[in-house]
Amino acid sequence: MKAYEVLYVIRPDLDDEAVAATVDKLSEVVTNNGGADVAIDKWGKRRLAYEVNDYREGFYILMNFNGEARTAQEVERIMKISDAVVRFLTTKKED
């Protein structure tokens, strides 16, 4: 299994419960698709470098996990169709 790192930004107008639900849902997607060792680091609400979808701020979440390529692809697919996620970046960590 490879190590992946996903940094994603959640809409700032969501309440804390909705943010937590989104984080839990994405962690569950990883574990349901063969991923393991999910680590979540919440960076909190920060200002974006530029306006994205009319938002100037967002909740930054860093998620690290081990999994196959299909696991990372499924997480990206879910984030693309999610209304809560404004932006995301997935990188494969070097060994």
Swiss-Prot record:
Highest taxon of source: Bacteria
Single GO MF descriptor: small ribosomal subunit rRNA binding
SUPFAM superfamilies reported for this sequence: Ribosomal protein S6 (SSF54995)
Keyword ATP-binding applies: no
GO terms under biological process: translation
Pfam families reported in the protein's UniProt record: Ribosomal_S6
Keywords associated with the record: Ribonucleoprotein, Ribosomal protein, RNA-binding, rRNA-binding
Any GO CC annotation of this UniProt entry: ribonucleoprotein complex
RNA-binding recorded as keyword: yes
InterPro entries: Ribosomal_bS6 (IPR000529), Ribosomal_bS6_sf (IPR035980), Ribosomal_S6_plastid/chlpt (IPR020814), Transl_elong_EF1B/ribsomal_bS6 (IPR014717)
CDD domains: bS6
Role according to the record: Binds together with bS18 to 16S ribosomal RNA.
HAMAP family listed in its UniProt record: Ribosomal_bS6 (MF_00360)
Family membership noted in the UniProt record: Belongs to the bacterial ribosomal protein bS6 family.
Designated name of the protein: Small ribosomal subunit protein bS6
Gene that encodes the chain: rpsF
